[in-house]
């Protein structure tokens, strides 16, 4: 079954009722699997979604780390869900995959939606229009006792709701991973830009 974001409420209820914890401050970004296509290929075929990709998958090559091909919820399940059959597949080293994409060694690649190198890649992120990949939303889980002892904490964390997009997080990761900037500097500047820190 496709992932249903509507079930997140069930999860928060279990945390609240059974574990006495609350989800407070949902940042807005989703660090899940994503599929990217070289921009030139996406433009040539008019690719915007995974369903679009399915129409032409037999003409394209697909790259991923070895473990994605082995996971029960990985390559085979993904292809089955969308009716895809790629011309060939390529096992990639995680550190070299963006270089391989840029060099045209493959057309399509699995990524994490907040990968730092995604910010600089000449690639199009496709929409998971059937909700195959589960969501990995980022937020804070805080013990209810802590929220009772420090009621100001809820107000502070709630200000973070929806403040960081996937693209924003990827850009910040890029600045830390590729440009060598200290994470605290990148975070401070971002929070200042959003008016959350002076």
What does each model-found stretch correspond to?
Residues 32-43, 137-150:
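A bilobed periplasmic-binding-protein/Venus flytrap-type ligand-binding module shared by bacterial periplasmic
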Residues 26-34, 128-137:
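Short Pro/Gly-enriched coil loops immediately N-terminal to beta-strands
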Residues 58-61, 79-92:
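A local structural motif
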